[in-house]
């Protein structure tokens, strides 16, 4: 089948054409990708690859607080505006990735910040973001919060210093019911100032039960307060060997999460799919096979749920690359370093064409 794609022409068997020609509901089943700002509007091979394959885009980090409003009096909309212009020009559907999240500025992470300073900065930034995207024709979804809960089910909070992965917004405090004020405030702002945009509660991790129970409890709490939560996102940074895409009980729990969303009139979004390695050889046959199986299992799970509600999948980066440190040391995606499509990408296309719903585990 892989050779079939090679010999039959990439354009005919692009993801967007497979979805259209195979009868998928194009208003409730989306497959897209993210690529780096450095490749945008430069007639680059990466940009051309994206446009040839996809019509669903998540701009990488251009809409986050750390970029747009990192400290009082400082605003920078240039990258955000460039992505919006690109999306509108090419008739793309966009999910804005600018959540209130740990990806915050050093100013926000500074240990001397007060609750009042953090709340003011958050309100200024998020209100303006919502106002700007509300009437953009390309923008369909936005991430409102991200990475709110640790794997053990506790709220993700601040750490000493300003260089760690931490969530400074939790310092604003908990309300009388024990929920972070920033989460509630973020959804209040989004509901008020972005009524035309679907609101997503994005999250990371694997399929840790305590973590997801806390997230679902929070969503129910928000809804009971009359706030709109239109979708749940899972980043899906998959691990090699024992990642969620390779473990039956985790895939079953993923299926449960999607069912829960659809029963609660919410969409389910796989928001940042890629494959993380520690010391494994990124070019080894076994690693590439496990990545392919993982990706097949994720997309097959989404295909199986397409009749009950909205599902989307976004690849976080088109090109495989080195990681930021010892873990992940390497990050695999759907094209290799030479921009050749990977086995995992062809597995996704094969599943989409066949409408495959079978879960396959490594031997």
Language-model segment annotations:
Residues 1-11:
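Bacterial Sec-dependent N-terminal signal peptides
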Residues 15-26, 84-88, 187-195, 223, ...:
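Surface-exposed amphipathic alpha-helices with a cationic face
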Residues 16-21, 69, 132, 143, ...:
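Aromatic-rich peripheral "rim/lid" segments of glycoside hydrolase catalytic domains that contact
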Residues 33-45, 65-78, 149-151, 205-215, ...:
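Acidic-and-aromatic substrate-binding clefts and catalytic sites of carbohydrate-active enzymes
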Residues 37-52, 121-130, 210-222, 292-299:
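Short, acidic/polar
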Residues 52-70, 79-200, 204-206, 266, ...:
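Substrate-binding cleft and catalytic face of glycoside hydrolase catalytic domains
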